[in-house]
Amino acid sequence: MAVQQNKPTRSKRGMRRSHDALTAVTSLSVDKTSGEKHLRHHITADGFYRGRKVIAK
């Protein structure tokens, strides 16, 4: 079984974890037809993508 030779410091632990934070979604697009907000390159909740109806509900 592997055993560490030196204990990692709090600083090294923090540096390793520095990229683990979650970021907020900043790039929301507005659909031309319905004016609804959605993630880029995704359809809206009512089935529109780039002004066209792609899924019939």
From Swiss-Prot:
The organism's taxonomic lineage, starting at the top: Bacteria, Pseudomonadati, Pseudomonadota, Gammaproteobacteria, Enterobacterales
Family stated for the protein in its record: Belongs to the bacterial ribosomal protein bL32 family.
GO BP of this protein: translation
GO-annotated cellular components: large ribosomal subunit
Endpoints of the signal sequence: none
Positions of region (Disordered): 1-37
InterPro entries named among the record's database cross-references: Ribosomal_bL32 (IPR002677), Ribosomal_bL32_bact (IPR044957), Ribosomal_zn-bd (IPR011332)
Gene behind the chain: rpmF
Organism: Klebsiella pneumoniae subsp. pneumoniae (strain ATCC 700721 / MGH 78578)
Keywords in alphabetical order: Ribonucleoprotein, Ribosomal protein
The name this protein goes by in its record: Large ribosomal subunit protein bL32
Keyword Ribosomal protein applies: yes
Entry's Gene Ontology molecular function annotations: structural constituent of ribosome
Cross-referenced SUPFAM superfamilies: Zn-binding ribosomal proteins
A Pfam family: Ribosomal_L32p
